[in-house]
């Protein structure tokens, strides 16, 4: 029997009642409609890289979305160098980024190395090194589970926010019958259109560490291919590029989002805590800094996790919770709760987990 541990980068999760593997838009639609007709819960999985599942059986349907064929295609190109590109939901995200550069296009190179699929990118509004995918998304083709229609969602309808979207926020809202949406939300992504630029130069480099490595000032542009290779090097150094032989990469990536606090709450943080403007009256701080300064450094683990531990923070990056080889969903959940409690006790800040959860409520 297929388990969620087989489908997630954390490699934890219980058995699946109904497992369906799809590799076309039509088969994806058919599987989702059948699952909704059955009355059970639905989980659509791409790379499984932003998912934490409990060890309990999932009494519903899991739809495992595979690549649809070609990585992407150019839909339209304007005289100013603006290029519209379409990629199917099952396309591996990093293969898409590589494809854009091989076709002389820039705009998503700073998002190199992020695991998962194109279909998941707008749901989470994936981001890294000063950029978010929302900056380049022109529209999303999605199946509306409420109306049964395929529709195209514009950015205004997608409601992008920090590591969030209207699709993600629909989870838990009233859904079919008397059941809330979840674990997959109201809309199932079928394809994504991106507005990119035909240029050898990257989007402006906005992340200080990346700018230093590239030898440019923040806000300047650099060779797009060099940005990609540098980002991949940085991510590897933090255990953020999937490697089956490296347990530091058996994770869901950055597990907690950076807290966005009212100015008054941010003012109570220690003087050394990072602070970034996040809109009127709001301040963003660093989850990694809070975790580290709450006594949860690299490699932190609970005593009951064993020796060597079955689950710990990455030895390279405190934001990643990792499976050291034989962890269960309960082990990862316990570690996450312990880190949250320590940060709250130290700073009065409640960290928000980023991954989609199955059978776990915070």
What would you call each of these model-derived segments?
Residues 16, 71-75, 114, 137, ...:
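Weak global preference for isoleucine
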Residues 1-147:
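Anion-binding (especially nucleotide phosphate/pyrophosphate-binding) glycine-rich loop
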Residues 37, 102, 293, 345-346:
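Residues at alpha-helix termini
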Residues 5-9, 47, 51, 150-330, ...:
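Phosphate/pyrophosphate- and phosphate-bearing ligand-binding catalytic cores of soluble enzymes
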């Amino acid at each position: 029997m297929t388990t969620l541990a087989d489908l997630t980068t954390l490699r934890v999760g219980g058995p699946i009642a109904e497992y369906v593997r799809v590799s076309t838009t039509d088969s994806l639609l058919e599987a989702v409609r059948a699952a909704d007709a059955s009355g059970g819960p639905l989980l659509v999985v791409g790379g499984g890289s932003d998912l934490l599942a409990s060890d309990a059986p999932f009494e519903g349907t899991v739809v495992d979305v595979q690549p649809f064929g070609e990585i992407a295609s150019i839909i339209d190109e304007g005289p100013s160098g603006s290029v519209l590109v379409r990629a199917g939901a099952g396309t591996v995200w990093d293969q898409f980024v590589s494809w854009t550069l091989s076709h002389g296009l820039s705009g998503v190179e700073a998002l190199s190395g992020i695991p998962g699929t194109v279909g998941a990118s707008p749901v989470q509004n994936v981001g890294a090194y000063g950029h978010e995918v929302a900056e380049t998304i022109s529209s999303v083709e999605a199946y509306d589970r409420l109306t049964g229609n395929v529709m195209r969602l514009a950015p205004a309808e997608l409601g992008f926010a920090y590591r969030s979207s209207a699709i993600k926020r629909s989870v838990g809202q009233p859904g079919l019958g008397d059941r809330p949406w979840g674990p997959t939300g109201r809309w199932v992504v079928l394809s994504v259109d991106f507005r990119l630029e035909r240029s050898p130069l990257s989007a402006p480099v906005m992340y200080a560490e990346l700018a230093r490595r590239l030898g440019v000032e923040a806000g300047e542009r650099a060779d797009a291919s060099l940005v990609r290779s540098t980002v991949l090097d940085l991510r590897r150094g933090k255990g953020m590029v999937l490697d089956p032989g490296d347990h530091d990469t058996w994770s869901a990536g950055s597990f907690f989002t950076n807290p966005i606090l009212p100015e008054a709450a941010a003012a109570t943080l220690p003087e050394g805590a990072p602070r970034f403007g996040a809109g009127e009256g709001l301040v963003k701080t660093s989850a990694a800094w809070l975790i580290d300064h709450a006594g949860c450094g690299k490699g932190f683990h609970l005593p009951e996790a064993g020796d060597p531990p079955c689950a710990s923070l990455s030895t390279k990056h405190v934001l990643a919770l990792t499976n050291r080889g034989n962890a269960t969903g309960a082990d990862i959940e316990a570690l996450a709760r312990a880190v949250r409690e320590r940060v709250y006790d130290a700073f009065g800040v409640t960290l928000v987990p980023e991954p989609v959860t199955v059978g776990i409520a915070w």
